Amino acid sequence: MAFQGTSRTLTQQSSAASSDDLQKILFSPDAIKKMATECDLGRHHWMRADNAISVRPLVPQVTSNNLLSFFKSGYDAGELRSKGYMSVPQVLCAVTRTVSTDAEGSLKIYLADLGDKELSPIDGQCVTLHNHELPALISFQPTYDCPMELVGNRHRCFAVVVERHGYIGYGGTTASVCSNWQAQFSSKNNNYTHAAAGKTLVLPYNRLAEHSKPSAVARLLKSQLNNVSSSRYLLPNVALNQNASGHESEILNESPPFAIGSPSASRNNSFRSQVVNGL
């Protein structure tokens, strides 16, 4: 038998040279660029009327070709126990709308296996988001590792599928989907506990809350005006103190001013709910 004893990592199973080859396949500048341009890893994908169905593989075709050749050569030489598997613990998608809340439409998002000609959701993990529900975070957890193989002329791997429904009269972008994942490749595989697709509705970012506390505005104005040497620029309600040392003590003893829009001002806004911003 080619392998005996306890389970080992891919690096332990293969030579250092082949491990370096695998690193080059996955992390070369060209591979990283392809992950962005072909797979939209960490990038915002716009859902438009002329792109109502989007299928984004989690591995670029060139990388799939290189991985398939790498594992096959190692398997044929007796150095690896299989022709390779792709493992993705979780896919996380941040979804935001780019039209008003009264627009009638929805998005259907799920994870599929490109080896399935019908592109059905894996284990029924599928999420439908109506426009008025956005923004939202969704997640998928495949229950198996995907073999690195060719099915007909298709490279088999996991893919994020997004379908746009409705939005009559809206020809442009109605939603933005930003997907993140971390693919792993190994010569061994496993099955995993089934979990339903995650769906978390997120509060829209309340940017008005940063400007709604008068005390924050007052502190900002006070800090700006008190920097001027002339006493006529002091706020009317601030007691005039001719003693320079006492004035310095007054400034030092009070809380430092927080600029509107600064992180400190945001932290001191006690009634703000936790939100996701900048997706």
Swiss-Prot record:
Principal location listed in the UniProt entry: host cell
Record's keyword annotation contains Cell inner membrane: no
InterPro entries: MPV
Key words of the record: Host cell junction, Transport, Viral movement protein
Compositionally biased residues, Polar residues: 263-279
Compartments, record wording: Host cell junction, Host plasmodesma
Region of interest called Disordered, as start-end residue ranges on this chain: 255-279
Pfam families: 3A (PF00803)
Transmembrane stretches, start-end: none
Family: Belongs to the cucumovirus movement protein family.
Protein's name in the database: Movement protein
Originating species: Cucumber mosaic virus (strain Trk7)
